[in-house]
A protein has these predicted regions:
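Alpha-helix C-terminal capping segments
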Residues: 11-18, 33-34, 106
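Helix N-terminus capping/helix-initiation residues
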Residues: 1-3, 92, 178
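C-terminal catalytic lobe of FAD-dependent flavoproteins
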Residues: 113-189
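A conserved short coil-to-beta-strand element within the FAD-binding core of flavoproteins
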Residues: 1-15
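Generic recognition of long tandem-repeat/solenoid scaffolds
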Residues: 12-16, 78, 143-145
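Short hydrophobic core segments
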Residues: 17-29, 160
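Active-site substrate-recognition segment that forms the wall
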Residues: 26-140
Length: 189
């Protein structure tokens, strides 16, 4: 609960834990963060299916507008859908059927696959498809590392290294990810 944070100009305290800085990595919940809600987040919901088949699967991830990730024991993940509204974190049967329909031309044997799970998540997308990195314009001990959307697993390692250098060595952030690109147009006191 963000209301339980005690923030001063020199420290941040929460439940007896004190730190010099706090980094918000709160996904699509950033839109409710009182310090960073001004950033133009564009969350999007996505469905992913876990299936099981008796047929052989490829040895690598397959991309065909959607993706198929082979797992062990005939299991696989199939994803992902895009849904702008509603953002309710509830499995969408139409999205599941669309995922299946998209894969059947490439993997017709999956028509007989068993559906094990139907998971939903909300991606923290951004207006310009670039992440949000940096410090609050007025409170330098509040930082954000967010907005990686559907490319988090690809983008986070590289950006994490740049972010670490930013607040340990004072190296500049990549301008494409620095939240200063939005301060003039979106931040109000």
């Amino acid at each position: 609960d963000l209301s339980e944070l005690n923030i001063s100009s020199s420290f941040v305290e929460w439940h007896g834990h004190t730190a010099d800085k706090i980094i918000f990595c709160d996904g699509y919940h950033l839109q409710h963060n009182p310090w960073f809600s001004w950033l133009p987040l564009q969350p999007v919901q996505g469905d992913i299916l876990t299936l099981k088949t008796d047929h052989p699967l490829p040895n690598e991830i397959v991309q065909f507008g959607k993706w198929l990730l082979p797992l062990a024991n005939g299991q696989l993940k199939l994803g992902a859908s895009w849904q702008w509204q509603p953002l309710d974190e509830k499995p969408n049967e139409k999205a599941a059927l669309d995922l299946l329909d998209a894969c059947y031309p490439y993997f017709p044997h999956l028509r007989q696959a068993q559906r094990l799970e139907h998971n939903v998540g909300i991606r923290p997308g951004t207006r310009d498809k670039q992440p949000f990195l940096g410090q609050h314009p007025e409170q330098s001990n509040l930082l954000v590392f967010n907005g990686f959307g559907s490319k988090g697993s690809l983008l986070i390692p590289w950006h994490a290294e740049r972010f670490l250098r930013y607040f340990t060595r004072a190296e500049p952030l990549p301008t494409s990810a620095d939240i200063n690109r939005y301060t003039h147009d979106y931040f109000t006191r």
